[in-house]
Amino acid sequence: MYHLPDTLYEQEKMPRRAKRLFVDTFSQHHKLNAGDEEAAMQKARQALEERYVRVNDLQWIPRRAAYEIIRDDMSSDSDGPAASPPGDHARPNRDKRRVSYSSSDSSARSSDDQLISARGSDDQLISTRSSDDHLVGAGKARRPARKKKRIGKVVASQKFVGGGAQYSTDDDEDDY
């Protein structure tokens, strides 16, 4: 049963995980003596192509690694070769991004602090934070923890203290 999937990747360089994924998917969809080898082979190939990318016609690498390689190549192309030495171009860019995020984050915090001291309204603070979130990006620092209300528990001020509902017995209000 394992000799059928072996025929596909005999000449290809596949990582061990990719081979295992292919064989497991093939054996899951292949029934003995059912004649569905082609369908099982196609499903195994699709499962392999979802997680791995073929490079140089014979080598397979994980899809995430391929995206990282492409992203690094694109960032190095946009910097230009004259801007930095060939080996040191990735690290300064990351540092610059971190600095810009932290400075924009601190400016957003200072504007929020000014808003609190000037107006003192929590509703306006929430609206400015939500509008500034798209500017700050993924590099922002964590906000201070807030006390959360527990679901299902009733705060003492919200409890019904009286013995029953109190209705007005005035006949003035019910004149029809």
From Swiss-Prot:
Transmembrane segments: none annotated. Residues 71-176 are annotated as: Disordered. Residues 140-152 have a biased composition (Basic residues). It comes from the Viruses. SUPFAM superfamilies: ChaB-like. Residues 77-87, 100-109 have a biased composition (Low complexity). InterPro entries: ChaB, ChaB_sf. This is Uncharacterized 19.9 kDa protein. It comes from Orgyia pseudotsugata multicapsid polyhedrosis virus.
